[in-house]
Amino acid sequence: ALPIFAAETLKVDWENCEIVRGNTDRHLPYSTYQAGSNTMFTEARTNHLAALDAIRKLKEIAAAELGGVADDYDIDGARVFATADNSRGMTYGEAAQAAINMGGEYSGETYPDNLNDVTKRAVEGLAGTGLIGVVKDSRHEGMPPSMAIGFMEIELDTQTGKYEIVDYSCVADCGT
């Protein structure tokens, strides 16, 4: 369950999370299951980055509503609060309501141009319903990591150091 990366980034207890996927009534596109090394490489980072975008917006909303600048604020999994006085803050729910009132990028009424078309449609469908954290992860460089293991049986001539390969087996996870 790769959404756990977003939950951990937002410091939200996993028990308080609801995963909803593949529900077009809620503007969530159908997708394949999440498994394999390629999925971990691509989707884990994207979930983390979307959560970082939400955190940035939570802090900016708190600064706009409560005063100061975004860097004056932090999160604890349920609230965004002033680091100098943690009694000055707001719940994630209150910040989501403020996002609706503020509009623009906070509520998904505007979003980055470089998003995938499916993601754009999802954001458009969710716009105005709360705080929207959304990004396109374009940092991927190189090939996704893969995992492989090989086993070799040899016959070794201990006098000459020469060997003969008797059997070889290899298993590779090529990603999904």
Predicted regions, residues:
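Cofactor-binding beta-sheet edge motifs in enzyme active sites
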Residues: 1-176
